Amino acid sequence: MHRLQVVLGHLAGRPESSSALQAAPCSAGFLQASASDVVVVHGRRTPIGRASRGCFKDTTPDELLSAVLTAVLQDVKLKPEQLGDISVGNVLQPGAGAIMARIAQFLSGIPETVPLSTVNRQCSSGLQAVANIAGGIRNGSYDIGMACGVESMTLSQRGNHGNISSRLLENEKARDCLIPMGITSENVAERFGVSRQKQDAFALASQQKAASAQSRGCFHAEIVPVTTTVLNDKGDKKTITVSQDEGVRPSTTMQGLAKLKPAFKDGGSTTAGNSSQVSDGAAAVLLARRSKAEELGLPILGVLRSYAVVGVPPDVMGIGPAYAIPAALQKAGLTVNDIDIFEINEAFASQAVYCVEKLGIPAEKVNPLGGAIALGHPLGCTGARQVVTLLNELKRRGRRAYGVVSMCIGTGMGAAAVFEYPGN
């Protein structure tokens, strides 16, 4: 029941994607560099904590956000006043975290002259923040901006849909927007034949990949250690420094996963083990116009090549990436075969398996360091976290390559973005 209330914003009709100018690949298969490119300069994230019982259960979201804002600026030695705008993805904090995010800005030493907004597109909020900042750069509003995502699922009011018209009872799609996310996962599994065995196998792979990545130090470059305090049952405070994700379970086995009962529906196949974790965390991504980055001597970690959002039926919202990814690839002039890494959010194994199979993506290209089933899914943070993880992994590999970030979105949508790593 707890998961039924807290697993939000995830998950066959054919959605239409908007038309866009096609980018033309160069003869080597990569897009031509341009002074007007929107580039990713740098990105950092906090460790991801388990909501309500983990390392950040007593840490406010403004502190999590401040930690990554401060780290990104310090890492590249950028003066805070040089930021043209800040966009913060958030889902569950009051007012989409508008006040909380502005407080975090000031806690990070960023002056009041730098504007800030928050955005809530549910589980794609962090990626939408990236798109919003990129849009401001493209339209000439500024040359440098910060895109962030943050969520404290511990310190949030869940299960409150607010004031909604009674007319939703007359409209099937409107009613479907209130279907619990776990039930949408069951709908995907039943409608598209995703077995419990496949879901558990996908979940096991996520845990194994994350455990391997953690043991090899693959997350060190992206994680900002956070010093905070936790309270025990007696109210005593203890200061701790958190430097790695809490949700990774190296001892996970198929046998253990098979013992878990369905979390949302009698006879169902979605369990706590093959669903994303309820989590706390934050991430920040610094973007700039290529010409400005070069002028200031800033590094270029990646290039944003395209972004797309599509709509899908709300009752199977988890299929969103299966339609958003082709739309983003089309805008970039690329195909599935051109992509080295797909960071697809693991809201539920059911929908992730469906999307991977629908698009024919080789398993080795999907979430090579694990995903939300193992790492956790702080709703507003996830999209920004995925960008940071993707580009750091491409950097580790060292060669020029493309990667995709994608996720499903509660109420029936999917989002995807294509990034290029320029090579060492």
From Swiss-Prot:
It catalyses: an acyl-CoA + acetyl-CoA = a 3-oxoacyl-CoA + CoA; 2 acetyl-CoA = acetoacetyl-CoA + CoA; hexanoyl-CoA + acetyl-CoA = 3-oxooctanoyl-CoA + CoA; tetradecanoyl-CoA + acetyl-CoA = 3-oxohexadecanoyl-CoA + CoA. Mainly expressed in liver; weaker levels in kidney, intestine and white adipose tissue. Keywords: Acetylation, Acyltransferase, Fatty acid metabolism, Lipid metabolism, Peroxisome, Transferase, Transit peptide. GO terms for biological process: alpha-linolenic acid metabolic process; fatty acid beta-oxidation using acyl-CoA oxidase; fatty acid derivative biosynthetic process; long-chain fatty acid biosynthetic process; unsaturated fatty acid biosynthetic process. The record marks H377 as: Increases nucleophilicity of active site Cys. Residues 1-26 are annotated as: PTS2-type peroxisomal targeting signal. The keyword Nucleotide-binding does not apply. The active site is at C123, C408. It is found in: Peroxisome. Pathway: Lipid metabolism; peroxisomal fatty acid beta-oxidation. The modification N6-acetyllysine is found at K173, K234. InterPro entries: Thiolase (IPR002155), Thiolase-like (IPR016039), Thiolase-like_sf_Thiolase (IPR050215), Thiolase_acyl_enz_int_AS (IPR020615), Thiolase_AS (IPR020610), Thiolase_C (IPR020617), Thiolase_CS (IPR020613), Thiolase_N (IPR020616). Its EC number is 2.3.1.155, 2.3.1.16, 2.3.1.9. PANTHER family: 3-KETOACYL-COA THIOLASE B, PEROXISOMAL, 3-KETOACYL-COA THIOLASE, PEROXISOMAL. Responsible for the thiolytic cleavage of straight chain 3-keto fatty acyl-CoAs (3-oxoacyl-CoAs). Plays an important role in fatty acid peroxisomal beta-oxidation. Catalyzes the cleavage of short, medium, long, and very long straight chain 3-oxoacyl-CoAs. Belongs to the thiolase-like superfamily. Thiolase family. The PTS2-type peroxisomal targeting signal, which mediates interaction with PEX7 and localization to peroxisomes, is cleaved following import into peroxisomes. This is 3-ketoacyl-CoA thiolase B, peroxisomal. It comes from Mus musculus.
